[in-house]
Amino acid sequence: NQCPQAYSYAK
């Protein structure tokens, strides 16, 4: 995955 799940949560 290029973007970690944690990053998606912050979005």
UniProtKB/Swiss-Prot annotation:
Keywords: Cell wall, Disulfide bond, Secreted. It comes from the Eukaryota. It is found in: Secreted; Secreted, Cell wall. The keyword ATP-binding does not apply. This is Thaumatin-like protein 2. The keyword Transport does not apply. Belongs to the thaumatin family. One of its GO terms (cellular component) is extracellular region.
